[in-house]
């Protein structure tokens, strides 16, 4: 008789004391035991295998996969059955055995599926190379340098590969035909910016919050940062939610958020509604910041700005009283005076609420406008429309109308605080980028410009905001450099 060459069904519906059937049964026991221990070794997390009725070894005997299998296969057939009372009893009820196998197999399969999913995520995120990042010297001035054309490393991401960009900044999708504005890299004079690595930044943001606070230019920079980090995050592991003034981009696998909070003047104003804020008669409360500030507490990286909303009038309207009380009377004061009051209020809030051991604070200087082409000696230009290259003559004196009085206030206040604030001096280097604005390739009042409007850049060109990918990516390279250098 050669029972090992015969094939038997996995489960028998009856058992007799005849030698042939006993042999068949023992073979079933051996095969099934091997199967179970195979499962055990495939996923060591399933600890219940050692106590399963079909195991002939006691739990303390199971050290490796060879031991129990050898003991079973070398025993005589009769002895195997004789010494395995749990097996003999279990086989009397084949349905019970089948249910037991199902109970073990399903958790194993589920665990394997989870493991494979984790491996897929890790594999997706591991596409970046692991070369070391060379940091610039601490004393290097990152903001003095020149724009260098570089179509090998820039742009840092593709417009059509970032689903989170709004129609306001997707210039190529909106009909812009030239793309050279995406290929300019900022080169500091005395050092170099480190290669941008999204995974490295995300590691620094693990279990942390980064928040941009301010106006639509800070929102411009926030969208850039979202696109920079999301490129290494697999689908389904990232999300964007907007609630009131707060927009939150979340990266699940790092438990990290990149957020934007709408507060165009930092302090309370009648322009604080995140949806209905296009108000020409702008009124502020320079000493009132707590309503906004409560949303900034506990954030690990704060990036503030306020500028563009100050520029529609020469004097600022300051409320006498409170919006909550329905007061409407105001006084008008000079722009720099009002700006200084707001910056002092902001500085006081920083010193009262920021723990420098936990939170890093940045303040971004003014993002410039390019309204008059004569500013860069182009008499045939129309605002920033049709500009395709930066101002490359770095020694040429020019002015695009930036209010440097506000720049001085912001710089002085940030440097005078007891809490460290890193001043992002983006103004001058951005003034060279007349080519990088959204111009007529954008939306207005929530709607895409019509062909007729696009043909009238003198009226409709947006020379305030920036295309993405584009200049705000460089601003974020400064943030990235500071964060990875200090943490």
Curated annotation (Swiss-Prot):
Keywords: Acetylation, Disulfide bond, Glycoprotein, Golgi apparatus, Membrane, Signal-anchor, Transferase, Transmembrane, Transmembrane helix. It is a single-pass type II membrane protein. Disruption phenotype: Strong constitutive freezing tolerance. Altered vascular apparatus morphology, and reduced xylan acetylation and secondary wall thickening. Reduced rosette-leaf growth and inflorescence size. GO terms for biological process: positive regulation of DNA-templated transcription; response to cold; response to freezing; xylan biosynthetic process. Glycans are attached at residues 151, 241, 255, 393, 412, 425. Contains 2 motifs that are conserved in esterases, but it is unlikely that this protein belongs to the catalytically active pectin esterases. This is Xylan O-acetyltransferase 1.
């Amino acid at each position: 008789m050669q029972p090992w060459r015969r094939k038997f069904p996995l489960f028998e519906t009856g058992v007799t004391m005849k030698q042939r059937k006993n042999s068949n049964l023992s073979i079933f026991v051996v095969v099934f035991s091997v199967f179970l221990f195979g499962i055990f070794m495939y996923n060591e997390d399933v600890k219940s295998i050692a106590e399963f009725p079909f195991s002939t070894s006691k739990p303390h005997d199971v050290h490796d996969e060879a031991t129990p299998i050898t003991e079973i296969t070398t025993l005589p057939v009769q002895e195997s059955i004789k010494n395995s009372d749990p097996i003999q009893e279990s086989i009397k009820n084949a349905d019970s055995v089948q249910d037991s196998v199902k109970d073990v197999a399903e958790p194993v399969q589920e665990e394997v599926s989870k493991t494979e999913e984790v491996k897929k995520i890790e594999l997706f995120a591991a596409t970046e190379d692991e070369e070391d990042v060379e940091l610039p010297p601490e004393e290097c001035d990152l903001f003095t340098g020149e724009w260098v054309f570089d179509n090998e490393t820039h742009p840092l991401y593709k417009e059509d590969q970032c689903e989170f960009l709004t129609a306001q900044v997707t210039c190529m999708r909106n009909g812009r035909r030239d793309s050279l504005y995406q290929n300019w890299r900022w080169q500091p004079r005395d050092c170099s910016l480190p290669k941008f690595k999204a995974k490295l930044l995300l590691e620094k943001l693990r279990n942390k919050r980064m928040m941009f606070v301010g106006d639509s230019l800070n929102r411009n920079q926030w969208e850039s940062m979202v696109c920079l980090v999301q490129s290494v995050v697999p689908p389904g592991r990232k999300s964007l939610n907007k609630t009131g003034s707060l927009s939150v981009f979340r990266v699940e696998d790092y438990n990290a958020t990149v957020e934007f909070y709408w507060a165009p003047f930092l302090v309370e104003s009648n322009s604080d509604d995140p949806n209905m804020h296009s108000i020409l008669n702008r009124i502020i409360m320079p000493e009132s910041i707590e309503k906004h500030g409560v949303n900034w507490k506990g954030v690990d990286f704060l990036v503030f700005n306020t500028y563009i909303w100050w520029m529609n009038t020469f004097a600022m309207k300051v409320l006498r009283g409170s919006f909550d009380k329905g007061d409407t009377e105001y006084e008008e004061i000079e722009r720099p005076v009002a700006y200084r009051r707001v910056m002092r209020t902001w500085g006081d809030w920083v010193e009262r609420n920021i723990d420098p051991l936990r939170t890093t604070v940045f303040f971004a200087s003014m993002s410039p406008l390019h309204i008059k082409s004569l500013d860069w000696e182009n008499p045939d230009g129309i605002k920033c429309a049709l500009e395709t290259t930066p101002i490359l003559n770095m020694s040429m004196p020019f002015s695009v109308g930036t209010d440097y009085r506000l720049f001085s206030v912001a710089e002085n206040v940030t440097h005078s605080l007891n809490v460290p604030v890193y001043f992002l001096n983006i103004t001058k280097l951005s003034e060279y980028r007349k080519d990088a604005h959204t111009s007529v390739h954008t939306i207005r009042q929530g709607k895409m410009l019509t062909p007729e409007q696009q043909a009238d850049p003198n009226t409709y060109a947006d020379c305030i905001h920036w295309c993405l990918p584009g200049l705000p990516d460089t601003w974020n390279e400064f943030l990235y450099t500071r964060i990875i250098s200090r943490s």
